[in-house]
């Protein structure tokens, strides 16, 4: 029984280490992508509207639902950024608006503009 407990503890430790490495990699690509998406959402274009609604969906999905097929209207770079941010938001340490400086005010302006 003790051997099982030792092996199980080792497995859990290795799993946690892998998750920490993965989380760091996801954040390394997700945070810059989030910053680019915020800039895009503050512009005035059809893509800006899609990105703004996407970000609001992550911010509060029940209040600001987002239709996934809208992502088809984005260019490849914005689409990739959305996927990176979505992956980062899958198991967040913080809410999406808390990951950027001035996020609360930025997201309030996105609500006023795109909700």
Where do the language-model regions lie?
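Polybasic, proline/glycine-rich intrinsically disordered low-complexity segments
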Residues: 67-115
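Membrane-embedded hydrophobic alpha-helical segments
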Residues: 1-3
């Amino acid at each position: 029984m003790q051997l099982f407990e030792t092996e199980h503890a080792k497995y859990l430790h290795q799993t946690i280490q892998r998750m920490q490495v993965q989380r760091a990699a996801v954040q390394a690509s997700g945070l810059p992508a989030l910053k680019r998406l915020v800039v895009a959402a503050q512009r005035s274009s059809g893509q800006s509207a899609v990105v703004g609604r996407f970000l609001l969906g992550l911010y509060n999905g029940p209040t600001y639902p987002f239709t996934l097929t809208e992502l088809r209207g984005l260019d490849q770079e914005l689409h990739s950024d959305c996927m990176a941010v979505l992956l980062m938001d899958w198991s967040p340490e913080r809410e999406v608006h808390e990951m950027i400086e001035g996020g609360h005010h930025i997201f309030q302006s996105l609500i006023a503009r795109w909700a």
